[in-house]
């Protein structure tokens, strides 16, 4: 049976689970071009079809790779949460903070920069990392 305490580890594991789910979305569900992608490029799908014929096939493969990386980040985050973070191994806080910033943190910031439709969802996905780090510092 997995213990819920310390809460910081459980919340971090939840953040890792969200990344697993996001990875699965990118691998199996996310279309190559979203409506927001076309808006950002100031294109419509019919306008872009002839210009970007092979782009969609290429993007599908790009998103497989990105999805696998996101999934792996989530998997490693869950492992870290239930091992080093839970036992407060030296350096665990810094690694988790840096990992959060360089993964979901940067993804969220960039999505705000481009005005993504998913920016608020990504911000919510960032909260478990922030809460886990705060609770870790508070020894909770």
Regions found by a protein language model. Give the residues of each.
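Hydrophobic alpha-helical transmembrane segments of polytopic
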Residues: 8-18, 66, 73, 92-103, ...
């Amino acid at each position: 049976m997995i213990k819920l305490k310390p809460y910081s580890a459980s919340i971090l594991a939840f953040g890792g689970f969200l990344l697993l789910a996001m990875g699965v979305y990118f691998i199996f569900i996310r279309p190559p071009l979203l409506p927001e992608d076309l808006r950002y490029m100031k294109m419509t799908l019919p306008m872009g079809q002839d210009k970007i014929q092979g782009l969609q096939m290429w993007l599908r493969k790009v998103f497989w790779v990105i999805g696998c990386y996101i999934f792996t980040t989530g998997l490693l985050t869950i492992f870290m949460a239930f091992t080093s973070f839970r036992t407060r191994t030296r350096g665990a806080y810094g690694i988790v903070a840096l990992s959060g910033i360089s993964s979901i943190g940067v993804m969220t910031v960039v999505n705000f920069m481009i005005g993504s439709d998913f920016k608020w969802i990504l911000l919510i996905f960032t909260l478990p990392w922030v809460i886990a780090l705060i609770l870790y510092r508070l020894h909770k």
